[in-house]
């Protein structure tokens, strides 16, 4: 995790159930969890165990709290290195004409805009791997840059074992996170638990983000 004046490295466990939910567990000290987040099709839940507080809200209430908006399926596609169409669960052949394609030899640039005017730019190589995804707002001042590297075969398909995610403002990084996957398992039973202790205080997602930006770890 890289924020202005605040850097932290940690073990993170990521669990995902396709088209349902995924869960992140941050364990920086000897496997002791300090932070957990679960994102489902319609809601976001976060537990901050160090400060005994939590977030539980649906996407409708979160609108306006984050500079970039996309649905669960779009976020799932970012984590699984897939092309996606803003606001859609999948891409059917009848939607192909919404994309603009530019090719330069084996490389390709694929672009699409959503109803808010956000521009989604996907860069792909000759093997049809997504190398990066950039989501920028109309003025091009703010953007989310998601880069993929260190591709290895998983179930016969290339998967990026490194993901670098940066929030950009005027072309400069304002903070981000780099994910290094040590291993990946697919098609295995997944148990997701998100019990919230009764004494924890409920707060908003914006309060969590503000805290991460202002406190040193």
Question: Model-predicted segments: where are they?
Answer:
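An acidic-aromatic
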Residues: 21-77
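Short, surface-exposed charged micro-motifs
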Residues: 13-14, 34-36, 119-121, 150
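Amphipathic hydrophobic-ligand
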Residues: 8-10, 35-39, 141-145
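A short, Trp-centered hydrophobic/proline-enriched beta-strand micro-motif
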Residues: 1-4
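C-terminal low-complexity, charged extensions that often adopt amphipathic alpha-helices
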Residues: 65-97
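Beta-strand-dominated lipid-handling architectures at cellular/organellar boundaries
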Residues: 7-15, 20
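Short, low-complexity, Pro/Ser/Thr/Gly-rich segments in the mature regions of secreted, periplasmic
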Residues: 200-217
């Amino acid at each position: 995790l890289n924020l202005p004046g605040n850097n932290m490295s940690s073990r993170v466990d990521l669990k995902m159930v396709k088209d349902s939910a995924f869960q992140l567990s941050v364990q920086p000290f000897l496997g002791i969890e300090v932070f957990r987040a679960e994102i489902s099709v319609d809601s976001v839940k976060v537990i901050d165990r160090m400060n005994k507080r939590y977030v539980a809200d649906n996407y409708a209430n979160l609108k306006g709290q984050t500079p970039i908006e996309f649905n669960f399926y779009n976020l799932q596609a970012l984590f699984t290195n897939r092309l996606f169409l803003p606001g859609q669960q999948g891409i059917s052949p009848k939607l192909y004409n919404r994309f603009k394609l530019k090719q330069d030899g084996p490389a390709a640039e694929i672009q699409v805009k959503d109803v808010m005017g956000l521009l989604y730019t996907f860069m792909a190589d000759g093997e049809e791997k997504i190398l990066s995804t950039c989501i920028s707002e109309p003025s091009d001042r703010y953007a989310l840059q998601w880069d993929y590297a260190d591709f290895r075969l998983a179930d016969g398909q290339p998967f990026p074992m490194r993901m670098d995610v940066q929030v950009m403002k005027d072309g400069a990084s304002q903070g981000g996170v780099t994910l290094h996957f040590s291993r990946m398992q697919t098609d295995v039973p997944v148990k997701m638990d998100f019990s919230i202790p009764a004494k924890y205080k409920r707060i908003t997602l914006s309060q969590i983000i503000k805290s991460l930006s202002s406190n040193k770890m």
